[in-house]
Amino acid sequence: MADYYNVGKVTSPHGIRGEIKVYPLTNVPERFYDIPYIWVFDEKDIPCKYEIENVKITSKGMVLLKLKGIDSRNDAEKLKGLFLKVDAENALKLEEDEYFITDLIGMKVYTEEGELIGTLEEVLQTGANDVYVVKAKEREVLLPAIKEVIKKVDVEGKVMIVRLLEGL
């Protein structure tokens, strides 16, 4: 099966002509202007390909999409809660030390000494730098995504090695 990457989640229908309101899961919402089609996976994980007919980005950072074949509010309602994905061909090309959030979620996080901290569960986008939320046994550990802390990321092995700074 091809690789697919989440780029948004449908939050609700918008209007009566089949538009959908999408919460972008990318730090570049404008990329929707350049994507010719999107993949939607239903509850049974069956993919369906939709051509993007129109894109608008709201002042609040949400994305409004009109997909070919989704022509009514009822059609749009059926997509509510589903993730929009791009295939590898349409994925953004990453720079060194950049990762797709979907690749980071679920990683086991270890200290440089080999001690398991926990599992990376969420990425907070704060502006200055991302913050990784790691679920430990009895608490959450917040790790700034900076070179001083993140020492190694093994996407294939789903492992991250970190150096804990004073106070973390």
UniProtKB/Swiss-Prot annotation:
Record's subunit section: Binds ribosomal protein uS19.
Entry domain remark: The PRC barrel domain binds ribosomal protein uS19.
Molecular-function GO term, any one: ribosome binding
Subcellular location(s) of the protein: Cytoplasm
Gene3D superfamilies in alphabetical order: PRC-barrel domain, RimM
UniProt xrefs under InterPro entries: PRC-brl_dom (IPR027275), PRC_barrel-like_sf (IPR011033), RimM (IPR011961), RimM_N (IPR002676), RimM_N_sf (IPR036976), Transl_B-barrel_sf (IPR009000)
Keyword Cytoplasm among UniProt keywords: yes
Protein name (record): Ribosome maturation factor RimM
GO CC term, one of those recorded: ribosome
